[in-house]
């Protein structure tokens, strides 16, 4: 079941250089991801061993992963004009801005088009401001219509004035192109210390969000620029570094209650074999070890992000798509039955504090269980029918409110 994008937060954002973007790019990524599964974890036993899952859970997860990669391999794609693109001649970037927009228009007509999409421009700093603005203007000039859930990602933000500048620019571009005001959303990349703590010692993120004047859809964490800015040695710059945990915690607190989506960063350990075909048996075995190690590493990082309340992250390589979906589905499936039982018990007792086995439930826990089941349905880990074992219909889950659910049942 594919839910409407209004019900969803994408589980990932896939980044790809603008110079490489073609109408068929999402489908090609899915095909490459399926090839990796077939080569390195094609059956339930090898899949379970690779990711450290028990066989029953692995069987359910693998089936869902394959179906996902065949039908909708990419949930969110970002056409990248920053790190994944680099600095090129003015004429070359002009050409890629136009060609990427035309390719996007064609891609919308193809099956499996991502329900979320957008572009990442260069930073609005003194060095790259003119280039960033020109790329965005040229891109929009080619677009007669925007796909749903289109966003512009602003990297390396250090000052609310940069968010305000992008907002002003989008106001003008929407008016020029005849788009509904406010259609284009902004994602702010939190990858500098200045985006965490302002020069006056206060939290910076609320000011950044405010400067976007209602356009800010999400905050995306950039772990490698952030750790480098914190003077952490290159060998220690990683997604699960304690410095990154602090930044993510600040992001969560700053965005709480604002309806803003949070995204974690990427793993740079890619599932790429060392030896190309034709390879000897020994080389194939070495490839298998290398790829499966990277798969497990990515899987574990995604699970860690999920456990810490980051339900979206970056993927940089098609080989990361299988483990992204596997981690998400496993995270929700393994807790479906306990969560559903606890929620059913909670609702049956009319929101009074109860005991379900040895686990104590109060109202806050019940709200968390409700949110868990809704996210599980929205990401495709399980169906509304499976979530109904909680005793709630999908409409009740979507209400997100125990008061509404209980009042409707008392009526």
Segments the model singles out, each with a brief description of its role:
Residues 1-411:
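Expand to "…catalyze enediolate/carbanion chemistry for C-C bond making/breaking, isomerization
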């Amino acid at each position: 079941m594919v839910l409407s994008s209004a019900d969803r937060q994408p589980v990932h954002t896939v980044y790809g250089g603008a110079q490489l973007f073609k109408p068929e790019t999402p489908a090609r990524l899915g095909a490459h991801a399926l090839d990796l599964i077939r080569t390195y974890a094609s059956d339930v036993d090898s899949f379970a061993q690779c990711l450290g899952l028990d066989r029953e859970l692995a069987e359910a997860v693998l089936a869902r992963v394959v179906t996902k990669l065949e039908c909708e391999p990419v949930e969110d794609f970002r056409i990248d004009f920053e790190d994944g693109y680099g600095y090129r001649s003015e004429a070359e970037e002009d050409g890629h801005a136009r060609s990427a927009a035309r390719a996007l228009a064609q891609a919308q007509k193809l099956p499996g088009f991502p329900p979320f999409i957008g572009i990442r421009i260069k930073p609005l700093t003194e060095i790259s401001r003119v280039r960033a603005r020109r790329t965005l203007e040229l891109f929009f000039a080619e677009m007669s219509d925007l796909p749903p859930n289109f966003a512009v990602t602003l990297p390396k933000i250090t000052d609310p004035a940069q968010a305000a500048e992008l907002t002003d620019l989008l106001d003008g571009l929407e008016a020029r192109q005849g788009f509904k005001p406010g259609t284009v959303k902004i994602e702010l990349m939190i990858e500098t210390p200045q985006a965490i703590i302002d020069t006056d010692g206060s939290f910076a993120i609320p000011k950044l969000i405010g400067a976007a004047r209602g356009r800010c859809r999400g905050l995306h964490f950039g772990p490698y620029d952030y750790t480098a800015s914190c003077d952490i040695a290159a060998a220690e710059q990683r997604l699960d570094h304690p410095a990154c945990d602090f930044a993510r915690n600040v992001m969560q607190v700053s965005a709480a209650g604002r309806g803003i989506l949070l995204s974690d960063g990427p793993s740079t350990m890619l599932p790429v074999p060392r030896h190309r075909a034709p390879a000897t048996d020994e080389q194939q075995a070495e490839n298998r070890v290398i790829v499966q190690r990277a798969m497990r590493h990515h899987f574990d990082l995604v699970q860690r992000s999920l456990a810490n309340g980051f339900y979206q992250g970056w993927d940089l390589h098609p080989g990361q798509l299988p483990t992204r979906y596997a981690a998400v589905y496993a995270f929700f499936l393994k807790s479906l039955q306990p969560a559903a039982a606890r929620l059913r018990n909670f609702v049956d007792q009319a929101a009074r504090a109860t005991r379900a086995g040895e686990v104590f439930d109060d109202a806050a826990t019940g709200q968390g269980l409700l949110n868990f089941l809704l996210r599980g349905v929205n990401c495709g880990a399980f169906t509304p029918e499976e979530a109904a074992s909680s005793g709630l219909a999908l409409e009740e889950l979507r209400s997100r409110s125990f008061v509404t659910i209980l009042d409707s049942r008392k009526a």
